Amino acid sequence: MSEHHNGTEASLSSEQRARAEMVKLGASFFQRGYATGSAGNLSLLLDDGTLLATPTGSCLGELDAERLSKVSLSGEWISGDKPSKEVSFHLSIYRNDPECKAIVHLHSTYLTALSCLEGLDTQDAIKPFTPYVVMRVGKVPVVPYYRPGDARLGEDLAKLASRYKAFLLANHGPVVTGKNLRAAADNMEELEETAKLIFILGDRKIRYLTADDIAELS
């Protein structure tokens, strides 16, 4: 009885920590301008196999730990406020990438601007010119534009999830995964800063990493 009780306490404290971390990281993204209004969403896998996600219409800067959405991997709304409609594409990634434990989706300025450009390499939107994107996420494929909530977005991400750790949704913004929420957040920030460099460099000639450079990092 005592062991069962202690296990329950440990599980609860683990979920409470996860909720607190989501609130903290959401506020950090908002305060530093990575997220505005009610744009973007976060999710993570809990120890019990369910998903914790930001609710529909929520501002990342004003999340309430007790009102975060809890959803099953089959998409059933378990508790908390109603989940974002975009949680469906989060679920598509989790179901197809066993290494993914957390997802950050933002409408951050520079990555969203990049997602609106024509002529991007759909296999890798960010040609490597610093080592850090290669080390953190590797290639970043472009997913075709669909209206937010369209089931086809999840279908496309499901096909890519086992091979990539980050995705650029055309005319929409980035989706980045991680082994935990902090890692996903760090990966997102690295990508956003790299996209910022792309616009700062503009038409200047960039010294891209060679195939050998990339091989040493992979």
From Swiss-Prot:
Active site (catalytic residues): 86, 132
Entry annotated with the keyword Metal-binding: yes
Name under which the protein is recorded: 3-oxo-tetronate 4-phosphate decarboxylase
Listed Pfam families: Aldolase_II
Biological processes per GO annotation: pentose catabolic process
Gene3D superfamilies in alphabetical order: Class II aldolase/adducin N-terminal domain
Cellular-component GO terms for this entry: cytosol
GO molecular function: aldehyde-lyase activity; metal ion binding
Keyword tags: Carbohydrate metabolism, Lyase, Metal-binding, Zinc
Source organism phylogeny: Bacteria, Pseudomonadati, Pseudomonadota, Gammaproteobacteria, Enterobacterales
Organism whose genome encodes this protein: Pectobacterium atrosepticum (strain SCRI 1043 / ATCC BAA-672) (Erwinia carotovora subsp. atroseptica)
Catalyses which reaction(s): 3-dehydro-4-O-phospho-D-erythronate + H(+) = dihydroxyacetone phosphate + CO2; 3-dehydro-4-O-phospho-L-erythronate + H(+) = dihydroxyacetone phosphate + CO2
Cofactor: binding comment: Binds 1 zinc ion per subunit.
Gene responsible for this protein: otnC
Task of the protein: Catalyzes the decarboxylation of 3-oxo-tetronate 4-phosphate to dihydroxyacetone phosphate (DHAP) and CO(2).
Enzyme Commission no: 4.1.1.104
Binding site for Zn(2+): 86, 105, 107, 172
Necessary cofactors: Zn(2+)
